[in-house]
């Protein structure tokens, strides 16, 4: 009975202790939260918010790992992203409550020092602390080491900075600590010390005697070849990284040989000439792996000198020129080498035909080297023990040699990204390579039979990628049953693929399936989900699947990514998707025909990416999305639907949400006050019905890059607090009712694109254009800006698009505008600019540079990214701070859009069309003088509009040089002379007008492009003649009463009024004089005239009496009576 009570007590204690973290550690985490910032100035974690509300047990909180036995916190992952946040001081006392802490990760935290008496040395009170990561924190390394050396329990220490980091020691440092003797890190096994640019290994002596050190990372420093003799103080050293140092010339082998336990040595990105032995003929027997390359001037000499590494198994020689014929002969002497890695290195054409003598070779890896030619049928085919061949992304052509089938030990083969061709079933190569586990032949010109029967004898195949080839039908072998079970299968973007291979019906262990970009039709193959219960990602976008999407009958615990975008799926989004796929990380159902509401259970606890854009979804957004209640939701796109209601609420709390796209819906309501204080990087809420004022940002936001609130009903001022968005690149608030002026502090922001057109903004541009050196697009059209265009416009050195039309600007066009070498589109139309045209305008749009045409934060590169995505998601819990992954996943397609009038219409340019578009519109101003001949130098211009001005003189003959021009409008000016005949050479001209000028002579011949212009292009010029005009040359011109329409409307009106007054007075006087003369000369006429006047008087009298006076009297008497 006593034993039972004891066991019950033990069980109770285990349940109490293990079921939930310790209260003191829970409180310590909450206190720590307010001190640990990410680099954007926001809280790195939200333990007090979402995590505390959903998980009482802090062991389930983000970035926290607890012991399964004790419930104590053993790991804190507080790694931040790479940003520009303000530095902060470390406080060791915040970490002391975690008594069992083993791993503390604080990389990229921008720690610049520590508060008094709270340095890292105080962490020695944590007896179990084994690993500390402080990489990318700008602390002086000497001071840092002198503090860390007291933590005697450390086994792994990671330090490092970017190579451009400079150091300054804060006043809080105790500089005398350097001279104090600390306990030393006698247990340290691994030390990282990167990027400090040091050249003296003695700096590490502050850590004491590191006799147990096995791994030392010293890349990106300034060590020279003498470093090897200094490393003898680490007798246990096995792994040494000295990449990107200053090790030049000949390296003394004896110093390396003294490192008797060294097994791995990385010397890449140095400038080594050879490994020399000056004393004796000693060999280094311990070294197994050697990494070289990148900048060696004599690679063959270096390889020849490697014979002293007598036990070398692996040799890496990356990003080098290995085209010397002697390379292969030098490699033959390395008889022990089994692994060759030549990534990014170009090899001699005789390399593959002569490598057969390296019979011990097991791995030959030579991707991305630009090697070309055909694959030889000798040499490399004699490597009978070869297990791995990687020829990825070279330029090999031709067919596969038959001798490839001799490599029967081959397990891993990559031929992707070449120009190989042929029917892969035309010979027996694949039937002989039955040891294959990994095969990638994607992105070639192979003909791949749909049956895949050439692999019928394979039993070990788990990875197969045949994408970007041509699929051919072979009905003879459609029903074979495979002996292998694939884990990865990709058949994406193949020519002529209209149905899935039948062997997939017998696959039950797939993890990754990529079938996107084909012509697959019919219902979505849900049977693939039913059969493969361990499927982690299915990628079926860009096909023609139709019908509703059905969920599998059983729960899929492993599915993490589903992409069925750009198909023809219809119906409603399935209910309870988060229950069917509880571990789902990414869901993309965009560009389909889905309708109905968004189900409330679509967002699971792990959901990271949700894209439902470009469908027909309606109704309101469910509450869990409206407040962004998912703890991991990083990317939410609901664009181009029929959604309505208030997407934002007071409970809006995006924990890690970085990309939010709500554009082109019917959302309404006000923007929340905390929208700029969130984790957002991109917010696109354009083309909705949002109202109210733009909220201010009360403190610095170092994360928001792109803000688009265009085409809503926002009003009020642009808040000054918007200047707290310290890294914003895109500001788009066009087509609202914003008034007032642009805050002057905006010029201090790193903006690249400003779109504020069609508002009610005013003031002078001088307060706006100041120091926008990064600006690419400035669109302020249709506002009330007044005053001159400031001379400071010349400082906008990167400006590509200047759009200031329909304002109240006046004055000259400043010549400083000609300093903008990247300027390609200029629209200053419908202002009050006057003065002559600057001749230097002719040198704009000459050099077409690659403008940044999109607000792209990340780029999409599918190849390998989906597999990497799943693997990375599994291995790393806190993905939202990693830009490395996202660079392979997302394409933020918020493009720069520029509206410009040409060919008598207004067009919106974007993408590559915008990149090549160039034009100048100065119409509807008061410009005077002649057109400068220099404007004919703009050989790349596509549109030029100078209409409705006061320009005079002749049309320059140099306009015949405008070979790319498509629209030329010179109408409504005062131009004279003839139309240059050379304009007939403008073969791209589609719209041409010189109407309403004073031109004379014959119009250009009615041929080529000028054969498409009718008389409206020339009307209003009475002295022009020739077809298509009515005036024939040699005859008197038919004058038009509208022959000289001036471009300055106010001046034209004044002249017309003067002519009217003069004509009216003369005509009226002539009539009076004629009437008086007639009455004087003829008495009958005079008597009749007076009778008519008398009768007219009586008629008016009685008319007034009967129709006005009598009715008024009658109503008055009636009221009185």
Swiss-Prot record:
Residues of this chain annotated as glycosylated in UniProt: 91, 224, 298, 321, 333, 372, 406, 531, 576, 588, 689, 771, 822, 937, 945, 976, 998, 1014, 1041
Source organism, top-level taxon: Eukaryota
GO biological process, one term: defense response to parasitic plant
Keywords, alphabetical: Cell membrane, Glycoprotein, Immunity, Leucine-rich repeat, Membrane, Plant defense, Repeat, Signal, Transmembrane, Transmembrane helix
Chief location: membrane
Cytoplasmic side: 1080-1121
GO CC entries: cell surface; plasma membrane
Parts of the chain that traverse the membrane: 1059-1079
LRR repeat feature ranges: 98-122, 126-152, 185-209, 210-233, 234-259, 260-282, 284-308, 309-331, 334-360, 383-406, 407-432, 433-457, 459-479, 507-531, 556-580, 581-605, 607-628, 630-654, 655-678, 680-701, 702-725, 726-749, 751-772, 773-796, 797-820, 822-846, 914-938, 939-961, 962-986, 988-1012
Subunit structure, interactors included: Interacts with an 11 kDa glycine-rich protein (GRP) of C.reflexa. Interacts with SOBIR1 and SOBIR1-like kinases; presence or absence of GRP has no effect on interaction.
Similarity-based family: Belongs to the RLP family.
Function summary: Involved in plant defense. Contributes to resistance against parasitic plant C.reflexa. Acts as a receptor for the 11 kDa glycine-rich protein (GRP) of C.reflexa inducing immune responses such as emission of stress-related phytohormone ethylene, reactive oxygen species (ROS) release, and hypersensitive cell death. Recognizes a specific pathogen-associated molecular pattern (PAMP), a cysteine-rich peptide 21 (crip21), from GRP located on the cell wall of C.reflexa.
Protein name, as recorded: Cuscuta receptor 1
UniProt source species: Solanum lycopersicum
């Amino acid at each position: 009975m006593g034993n039972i009570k004891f066991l019950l007590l033990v069980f109770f204690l285990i349940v109490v202790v293990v079921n939930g973290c310790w209260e003191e550690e829970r409180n310590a985490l909450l206190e720590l939260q307010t001190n640990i910032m990410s680099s954007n100035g926001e809280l790195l974690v939200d333990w007090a918010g979402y995590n505390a509300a959903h998980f009482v047990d802090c062991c389930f909180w983000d970035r926290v790992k607890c012991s399964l036995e004790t419930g104590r916190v053993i790991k804190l992952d507080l790694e931040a992203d790479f940003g520009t946040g303000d530095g902060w001081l470390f406080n060791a006392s915040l970490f002391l409550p975690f008594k069992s802490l083993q791993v503390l990760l604080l990389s990229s935290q921008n720690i610049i020092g520590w508060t008094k008496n709270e340095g890292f040395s105080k962490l020695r009170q944590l007896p179990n602390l084994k690993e500390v990561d402080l990489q990318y924190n700008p602390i002086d390394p000497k001071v840092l080491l002198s503090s860390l050396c007291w933590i005697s329990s450390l086994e792994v220490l990671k330090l490092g900075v970017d190579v451009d980091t400079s150091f300054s020691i804060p006043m809080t440092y105790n500089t005398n600590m350097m001279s104090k003797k600390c306990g030393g890190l006698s247990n340290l096994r691994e030390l990282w010390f990167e990027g400090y640019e040091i050249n003296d290994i003695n700096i590490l002596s502050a850590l004491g005697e590191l006799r147990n050190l096995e791994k030392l990372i010293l890349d990106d420093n300034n060590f020279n070849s003498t470093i090897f003799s200094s490393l003898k103080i680490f007798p246990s050293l096995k792994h040494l990284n000295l990449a990107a140092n200053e090790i030049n010339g000949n390296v003394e082998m004896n110093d390396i040989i003294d490192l008797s336990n060294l097994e791995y040595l990385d010397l890449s990105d140095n400038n080594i000439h050879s490994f020399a032995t000056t004393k004796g003929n000693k060999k280094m027997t311990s070294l197994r792996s050697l990494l070289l390359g990148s900048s060696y001037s004599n690679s063959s000499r270096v390889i020849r000198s490697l014979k002293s590494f007598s036990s070398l198994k692996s040799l890496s020689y990356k990003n080098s020129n290995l085209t010397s014929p002697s390379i292969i002969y030098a490699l033959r002497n390395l008889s022990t080498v089994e692994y060759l890695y030549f990534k990014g290195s170009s090899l001699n054409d005789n390399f593959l035909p002569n490598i057969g003598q390296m019979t011990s070779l097991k791995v030959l890896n030579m991707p991305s080297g630009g090697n070309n030619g055909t694959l030889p049928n000798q040499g490399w085919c004699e490597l009978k023990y070869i297990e791995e061949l990687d020829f990825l992304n070279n330029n090999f052509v031709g067919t596969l040699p038959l001798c490839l089938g001799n490599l029967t030990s081959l397990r891993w083969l990559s031929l992707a990204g070449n120009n190989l061709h042929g029917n892969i079933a035309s010979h027996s190569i694949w039937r002989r390579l039955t040891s294959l586990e990994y095969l990638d032949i994607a992105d070639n010109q192979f003909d791949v039979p749909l049956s895949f029967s050439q692999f019928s004898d394979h039993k070990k195949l788990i990875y197969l990628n045949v994408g970007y080839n041509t699929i051919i039908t072979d009905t003879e072998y459609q029903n074979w049953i495979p002996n292998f079970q694939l884990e990865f299968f990709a058949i994406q973007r193949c020519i002529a693929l209209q149905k899935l291979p039948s062997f997939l019906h017998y696959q039950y262990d797939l993890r990754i399936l990529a079938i996107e970009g084909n012509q697959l039709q019919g219902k979505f193959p849900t049977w693939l989900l039913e059969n493969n219960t361990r499927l982690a990602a299915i990628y079926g976008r860009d096909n023609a699947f139709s019908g509703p999407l059905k969920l599998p009958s059983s729960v899929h615990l492993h599915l993490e990514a589903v992409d069925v975008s750009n198909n023809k799926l219809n119906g409603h989004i399935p209910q309870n998707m988060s229950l069917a796929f509880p571990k789902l990380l990414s869901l993309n159902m965009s560009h389909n025909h889905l309708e109905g509401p968004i189900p409330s259970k679509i967002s699971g606890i792990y959901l990271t990416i949700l894209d439902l854009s470009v469908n027909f979804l309606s109704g309101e957004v469910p509450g869990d999305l409206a407040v962004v209640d998912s703890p991991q939701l990083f990317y939410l796109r609901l664009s181009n639907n029929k959604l309505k209601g208030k997407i934002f609420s007071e409970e809006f709390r995006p924990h890690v949400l970085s990309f939010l796209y709500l554009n082109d819906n019917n959302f309404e309501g006000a923007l929340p006050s905390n929208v700029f204080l969130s984790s957002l990087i991109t917010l696109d809420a354009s083309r909705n019905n949002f109202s109210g004022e733009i909220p201010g940002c009360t403190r610095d936001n170092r994360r928001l890059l792109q803000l688009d609130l265009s085409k809503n009903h926002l009003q009020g001022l642009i808040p000054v607090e918007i200047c707290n968005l310290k890294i914003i690149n895109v500001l788009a608030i066009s087509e609202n009712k914003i008034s007032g002026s642009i805050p002057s502090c905006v010029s201090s922001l790193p903006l690249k694109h400003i779109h504020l057109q069609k508002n009610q903004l005013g003031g002078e541009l001088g307060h706006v254009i100041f120091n926008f050196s990064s600006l690419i697009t400035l669109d302020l059209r249709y506002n009330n800006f007044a005053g001159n265009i400031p001379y400071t416009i010349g400082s906008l050195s990167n400006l590509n698009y200047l759009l200031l039309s329909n304002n109240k600007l006046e004055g000259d066009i400043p010549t400083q505008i000609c300093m903008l070498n990247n300027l390609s589109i200029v629209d200053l139309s419908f202002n009050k600019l006057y003065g002559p045209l600057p001749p230097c305008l002719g040198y704009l749009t000459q050099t077409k540079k690659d403008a940044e045409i999109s607000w792209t934060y990340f780029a999409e590169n599918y190849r390998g990214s989906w597999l990497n995505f799943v693997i990375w998601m599994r291995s790393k819990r806190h993905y939202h701070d990693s830009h490395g992954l996202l660079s392979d996943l997302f394409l933020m397609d918020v493009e720069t859009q520029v509206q410009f009038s040409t060919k008598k219409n207004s067009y919106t340019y974007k993408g590559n069309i915008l990149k090549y578009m160039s034009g100048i519109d100065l119409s509807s101003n008061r410009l005077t003088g002649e057109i400068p001949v220099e404007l004919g130098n703009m050989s790349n211009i596509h549109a030029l509009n100078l209409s409705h001005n006061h320009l005079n003189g002749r049309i320059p003959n140099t306009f015949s040089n405008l070979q790319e021009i498509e629209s030329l409008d010179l109408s409504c000016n005062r131009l004279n002379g003839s139309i240059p005949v050379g304009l007939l050479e403008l073969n791209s001209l589609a719209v041409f007008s010189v109407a309403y000028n004073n031109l004379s002579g014959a119009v250009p011949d009615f041929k080529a492009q000028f054969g498409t212009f009718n008389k409206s292009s020339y009307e209003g010029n009475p002295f022009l003649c020739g077809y298509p005009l009515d005036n024939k040359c040699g005859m008197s011109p038919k004058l038009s009463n509208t022959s000289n329409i001036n471009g300055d409307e106010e001046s034209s009106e004044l002249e017309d009024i003067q002519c009217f007054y003069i004509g009216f007075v003369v005509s009226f006087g002539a009539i009076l004089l004629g009437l008086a003369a007639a009455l004087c000369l003829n008495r009958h006429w005079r008597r009749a005239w007076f009778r008519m006047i008398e009768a007219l008087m009586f008629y008016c009298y009685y008319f007034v009496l009967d129709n006005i006076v009598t009715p008024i009297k009658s109503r008055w008497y009636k009221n009185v009576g």
